[in-house]
Amino acid sequence: MKRGALVFCAFTILLLIVFGIVACTGNGSSLESNNSSESGNQESNTATDTNEQNAYTVLFSCDTSLGKIIGEAEQTVLEGEKTSPVSVYVNYGYRFIGWSSGATEPEISITVSENCEISAIIVPVSDSIPTVSILTDGKEEITSTSEYLNCVVSIGNANEIYCFENEGAKIRGRGNTTWEYEKKPYRLKFDTKIDLFGNGKAKDWVLLTNYSDLSLSRNFLAQSVTSLFGTINSCCSVQFVELYVNEEYLGVYLICEQIEVEKSRIEITKSVDVDTGYLIELDNRKDGRYFKIGSTPYVIKSPSTDSSAYTDEHEEFIKSYLTECFIAIGGNDYDKICSLIDVESFAESYIVYELFNGVDVGYSSFFMYKDAGGKLHAGSPWDFDRSLGIVGHSKGAKPYDALWAKEQNTWFYWLLRHEEFNSLVGEKLTEYAPKIKEKLNECYEYLYKNREAFEKNFEKWDILGTFVWPNDDELTTLNTWDLQVEYTRNYLNNSLDFLITTYCPNNTN
């Protein structure tokens, strides 16, 4: 009896458990059904909301040859909401002036109301020359070529990444004859290294006036051609600017790299060792510590002769090396010459000087350098104020076929006595003549695009049609900027053709 009761109880409990599970399962299904229903209602509501709030596509664009969009260029955004911010990066040589929507800041975000495309408006920088504004402390006048004044420098009207305001610097006058003109040249030294117009970071820069060059273009053209060559282009970057000093407009200037031993310029060894890097200038003005080889003076530009680390041994070392090179070029062993001198650089330098008939090539501003353990290199050609027919007292340099550099520069004179060097010049001309023609065409296009700025310069300095030394009567009679520019163009075309005929007799181009 007792056993039967136990069995009955167990059976009863089992039934309760089974029915409980079924009941729970039934409730769960009901809950799932309810949840499903609610979910369906939510989806339905969302679908309704989406239909009521339209999504639109916005495309931010620019000419990819001029710049690029930074950020999400194509975005899908609900009506009434804002796009994610994007900005425009502009390639060097161009500037951003606004968006097609009317916005003027480089970064943009808009509230969306329709499908649309918004384009960045980018134009060449050459449409307007950059401005450089210099304020000296207390607006003190710059009167010295040796004493610096403190100043701040601002650059505008250029690619955004090269614009800045109130950078600390120092400024002084520079030049010899050029300092005597009304329009003064300057030397600028920033407190920290600055990259001006993509030409590499440096503290030292030069502001040339081109005052006696009534085309304002000779130095610009010469440095532009120099930039084509692989061995002499270390310090040839230039940029036209409109200069303001103490809020006074001073005209169009040319910002140039200072020829110096520096990263991104002439990159040679700096050390206290005797066999270190040397930068030398052939300079009959003897502007600094110098030595002579024969009757020609050479000034040591680097290492600094004012440094306590500089000794007589340094001077003797570089003088001895240059003497060995000079003896070699006067001899008959061309292999010996090539072991001491980088003849490629001298051939390229010769082409530039001869093409432009640079008057001072044998007198001053002829740079050479030698790295530790290395050969003697020709440096970047420099100073073309007197060139392309501006000759002063050097009447023999006037004709485009004068071969002035060959006759006046002692290094070129002796090197060109070697047939191998003549052949090298011919090979270089054959290779580079088409590139030179193309580069010059680009340069003249740039000049004419900026006509307004150049003509404004002569509103400040009313010298067209008047005598400015060292111009002769022929150049003085060219009384418009256009006539002056056209003169340089014709001269260069004739000069290049003459050099090709002289050194590339088999060239049929």
Per-segment meaning from a language model:
Residues 129, 142, 167, 175-177, ...:
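Middle-to-C-terminal accessory/interaction subdomains
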Residues 125-217:
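Conserved NTP-binding catalytic cores of kinases and kinase-like/nucleotidyltransferase enzymes
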Residues 81-83, 103-125, 148, 178-183, ...:
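Extracellular interaction modules
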Residues 20-23:
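C-terminal motif of bacterial Sec signal peptides marking the signal peptidase cleavage site
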Residues 25-27:
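Bacterial signal peptide processing site
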Residues 194-195, 209, 231-234, 248-351:
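Internal "kinase-insert"/substrate-recognition segments embedded within catalytic cores
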Residues 35-38, 42-124:
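Secondary-structure capping and domain/repeat boundary segments
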Residues 229-242, 358:
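Short, well-structured beta-strand/strand-turn elements
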